[in-house]
Amino acid sequence: MKIGPTLRRILQSAIVTCALTVGAQAQQSDLMPLHTMQDSQGWAAVGRLDIRGKGFCTAALIREQLILTAAHCVFNSDGTPIDTTLFEFRAGLRDGRAEATRSISRAVPHPGYQFKENATDAPAVALDIAVLELARPIRMARLQPYQIAPRPL
C-alpha cells in the first residue's frame, strides 16, 4: 500500500511520540469516570473506535479528519484487514454519548507493522500504530485534535 508524504510524516511523528512514552508507568491505577464536561476537559479528542461485532479500541483525533490507534485494531484475528465499513469513531464519549460520530474511509497501519496476535515484544509493539481517515472531518470547538509534530523530532 502506498502512503503519501504527509501521512508518512504523521506516522513517523506518532512513532516517536509513542517511543518516548513506552515504559512509562501510571502513578496510580484508579480510573476516574468522566461524567461532566469539566471531568472530560482535555480528553474530548479521545474516543472509541467501535468495530462492529468485534469490540472496540481507543483512538485519538490528531487532525480534523485523522485518528490514531493501534495497528492491531484494524486486523482480524487471522491477520486480514478489517473492512473499514465496520468501523465507527465516537469522539468525546462520555456517559455513553459521543459528541461526534464518524465512519472511516481508510485505515493505514505503519508500513513495517506485521500482525502477530498478542505480540508483546518491544520491536512489534513499537510499530503497532495506525492512522485512520474519517469519512468527514470533525470541526467542533470542543473537539480539537491533539497536537503532534509535523515531522519527526
Show which residues each predicted segment covers.
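Conserved catalytic-core segment of clan PA serine endopeptidases
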Residues: 28-41, 75, 81-139
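Flexible, gly/ser-rich surface segments that form the specificity/activation loops bordering the active-site cleft
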Residues: 120, 140-153
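Cytochrome P450 catalytic-core helices
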Residues: 65, 69
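N-terminal post-signal-peptidase region of extra-cytosolic proteins
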Residues: 47, 55-56, 70-78, 143-146
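Generic detector of contiguous secondary-structure segments
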Residues: 49-56, 91-95, 151
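"Short basic amphipathic alpha-helical interaction patches in structured regions
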Residues: 62, 104-105, 144-149
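Protease-domain processing segments flanking chymotrypsin-fold serine proteases, especially trypsin-like
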Residues: 2-63, 108
